[in-house]
Regions:
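Structural recognition of the beta-strand scaffold that forms the well-ordered cores
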Residues: 94, 120-123, 169, 178-181, ...
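Papain-like cysteine protease catalytic cores
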Residues: 118-248
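Bacterial Sec-dependent N-terminal signal peptides
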Residues: 1-25
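N-terminal regions that are enriched for targeting/export leaders
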Residues: 25-82
Length: 464
């Protein structure tokens, strides 16, 4: 009897513990009375409250002292033509990567304008990512359902976001076609509904693969049947990728230069022809991790038989050196950043002085870049194409930069965004640069073994 009483008392004590903790850590009536004094209801509070009832915070926080447009002159600028538009999709990584190649092709062949088919590469991106997920499920079939990697796979079966490794892997494997050989469709421009159905199907297929008891050969046959269904659905949504096509090349005077039949691979080899897998490196400014080290993100790739995302972490000033060298040589770069921070979309500027949130809210915001990353307050969210820098003649230091965006020509400054150098320091994260612009000491860093980071590391979400 004594034992039963003791157990009952212990259960009562355990049951009361959360309530006790809640009482100590909760907002009491006295605390509420005290903190409510912060709102004084004076003329200043009333004016701000009235304004916030009828207008957005971003509009009211616009800094009147910074309303003048940033000077649009740049000392060095890559020659480009035209602005692309990813519409309502997360394909910025693809547009940025192809825009780097597009600028080179327009300049080299004196084209009036040109776009590669983003839809063509996107078709294979989605097919390859579906295979990546399904094969990942097969590879982890011996792990429990609550294993971190299994949970991550089912939480992230598919995305339309990505990064430059996807561009290099997919273009190398499947080639390229002009935009008119496989034009955009409603589903490529508006990916949400298509992605939702694919993710639902992948999760169902993933469960089937995990519960299957067959041999590896049988599992691979199941996966192939699943991919057959997915290929059909992608074709319904995006169209079927061309096996061959005819392309008429004209110069900037609109004179026909050639008319020729191509395959996607022969078109890529003739007009791009560079080794995307080995000619470029990715550098990153992540102040939370040690500089001078190479990092690899496990399972962060677009193609199962491709390679993981690999980068070297560098101080921002070293990254600027390479960016300036590339721009001066008329070569655009894949660039990614936390684009929404302090962005004036109407003017097309990224400037720390665009908005004065502190005066409006009464808050102070003092976190540095490292602290923002560590607390999930900042991270790379969008990829664009770095095309210009303005260097001060006296100091030799950059004053501002310009990126070609993929939100259409009506967005920002003629389809571009202009950023101050101070904004670059705080919110730039990744740059992909050709090796010929990279100093020897940085190239040597890639000879060391990379530090392997897990796929679920919060710093490495896909760029959209």
């Amino acid at each position: 009897m004594r034992r039963i009483t003791t157990i009952f008392a212990a259960l009562l004590m355990a049951a009361s513990l959360p309530l006790s903790l809640s009482a100590q850590g909760g907002i009491s009536a006295d605390m509420l009375k005290e903190i409510s004094k912060a709102y004084e209801g004076n003329a200043n509070d009333k004016a701000i409250r009235n304004a916030l009832n009828t207008a957005s915070i971003s509009v009211l926080a616009e800094n009147a002292e910074n309303m003048a447009m940033i000077d649009t002159h740049f000392s060095d600028e890559v020659r480009t033509k035209g602005i692309t538009d990813q519409k309502s999709s997360g394909r910025c990584w693809l547009f940025s990567g192809l825009n780097v190649l597009r600028a080179k092709m327009i300049d080299k062949y004196d084209l009036p304008s040109f776009e590669f088919s983003q839809n063509y590469i996107f078709f294979y991106d989605q097919l390859e990512k579906c295979n990546l997920f399904l094969q990942g499920i097969i590879d982890t079939r011996g792990l429990s359902d609550d294993d971190r990697k299994v949970d991550w796979l089912f939480s992230n079966p598919l995305s339309d976001g990505g990064q430059f490794t996807g561009v290099s892997n997919l273009v190398t494997k499947y080639g390229l076609v002009p935009s008119d050989a496989m034009p955009e469709t409603f589903c490529s421009n508006n990916t949400s509904a298509m992605s939702s159905l694919l993710k639902l199907k992948l999760r169902e297929d993933g469960l089937r693969l995990r519960s299957a008891k067959g041999s590896m050969k049988q599992l691979l046959a199941m996966k192939e049947a699943m991919l057959t269904e997915i290929y059909r659905f992608l074709t319904l949504c995006l169209g079927e990728p061309p096996v061959s096509f005819k392309w008429t090349r004209c110069n900037s005077k609109d004179e026909i230069v050639s008319v020729k039949e191509y395959t996607p691979k022969s078109f890529y080899e003739e007009f791009v022809g560079e080794d995307l897998e080995n000619n470029y490196i990715m550098v990153m400014n992540d102040p939370c991790r040690e500089y001078g080290k190479v990092y690899e993100i496990d399972y962060d790739r677009h193609v199962y038989d491709g390679h993981n995302w690999l980068y070297v972490n560098l101080p921002v000033e070293r990254i600027k050196e390479m960016a300036i060298a590339s721009i001066k040589d008329n070569t655009a770069m894949y660039f990614s950043c936390d684009v929404a921070k302090f962005m004036d979309r109407n003017k097309g500027t990224l400037d720390l002085a665009n908005f004065d949130y502190e005066s409006l809210s009464g808050f102070t915001f003092g976190m540095d870049k490292s602290e923002r990353v560590r607390t999930h307050a900042s991270g790379s969210s969008h990829a664009m194409t770095l095309i210009a820098v303005d260097i001060d003649a006296e100091s030799g230091k950059p004053v501002k930069w310009m990126v070609e965006n993929s939100w259409g020509p009506a967005s920002g400054y003629k389809g571009n965004l202009i950023m101050t150098d101070e904004w670059f320091n705080e919110y730039m994260f990744r740059l992909v640069v050709e090796k010929k612009y990279v100093p020897a000491d940085i190239l040597k860093m890639f000879e060391s073994d990379p530090v392997l980071l897990p796929a679920w590391d919060p710093m490495f979400s896909p760029e959209n």
